[in-house]
Swiss-Prot record:
It comes from Aliivibrio fischeri (strain MJ11) (Vibrio fischeri). Participates actively in the response to hyperosmotic and heat shock by preventing the aggregation of stress-denatured proteins, in association with DnaK and GrpE. It is the nucleotide exchange factor for DnaK and may function as a thermosensor. Unfolded proteins bind initially to DnaJ; upon interaction with the DnaJ-bound protein, DnaK hydrolyzes its bound ATP, resulting in the formation of a stable complex. GrpE releases ADP from DnaK; ATP binding to DnaK triggers the release of the substrate protein, thus completing the reaction cycle. PROSITE patterns: GRPE. GO terms for cellular component: cytosol. This is Protein GrpE. HAMAP family: GrpE. InterPro entries: GrpE (IPR000740), GrpE_coiled_coil (IPR013805), GrpE_head (IPR009012). One of its GO terms (molecular function) is protein homodimerization activity. The lineage of its organism: Bacteria, Pseudomonadati, Pseudomonadota, Gammaproteobacteria, Vibrionales. Belongs to the GrpE family. One of its GO terms (biological process) is protein folding.
Length: 194
């Protein structure tokens, strides 16, 4: 072999070694770059998961707050409705003796006396107007004559045997009862058939 051929062979070997060294360095550099990219990807994925969990938690908090707000609003509306419905309860209770007295005046008035007749007509008109006015505000008369006894609406003063009435039926109403918006203000006082 000649010197020139040796030099060419040596140069080829050196180039191969340089390429081999370069390739190993490139591989190490590529591996470290890949490792750092994988670490960065893992870090970003962890941050994404944490952010998604935080978003879900905040959405849950917002939903709970909205539900609580709706519950508070609903309760407040119910309280206002109850206050409106039953604000008149005490006032209506005080009006019941007036209704009773107007009815007694009609029952006990002398209908044969001409002078008292006009007065009784006035009392009857007053009673009708008064009853229709209080009915507009939810006051309802309980007059259970001939109905089955209901302890929620009636107060039994006594029981009496009666062949004309079925057992456990109201045969005499001693005092009418009243409800205000479906709540018993005063039960009707009744005599019940045995």
């Amino acid at each position: 072999m000649s010197n020139e051929e040796n030099k060419v062979n040596e140069e080829a070997v050196v180039e191969e070694q340089v390429e081999a060294v370069g390739t190993e360095a490139d591989v190490e550099w590529n591996e470290s770059a890949e490792d750092s990219q994988e670490a960065k990807i893992a870090e970003l994925e962890a941050a994404l998961l944490a952010s998604q969990a935080q978003i879900k938690e905040q959405q849950d908090t917002v939903l709970r707050a909205k539900a609580e707000e709706q519950n508070v609003r609903r309760r407040a509306e119910e309280d206002v409705d109850k206050a409106r419905k039953y604000a008149l309860k005490k006032f209506a209770g005080e009006l019941l003796p007036v209704l009773d007295n107007l009815e007694r005046a009609l029952e006990n008035g002398d209908k044969e006396n001409e002078a008292a007749k006009a007065l009784l007509e006035g009392v009857e008109l007053t009673l009708q107007t008064f009853v229709s006015t209080v009915e507009k505000f939810g006051l309802t008369v309980i007059n259970p004559m001939g109905e089955a006894f209901n302890p929620e609406l009636h107060q039994a003063i006594g029981m009496q045997a009666s062949p004309d009435h079925e057992s456990n039926t109201v045969m005499i109403v001693m005092q009418k009862g009243y409800t205000l918006n479906d709540q018993v203000l005063r039960p009707a006082m009744v005599m019940v058939a045995q």
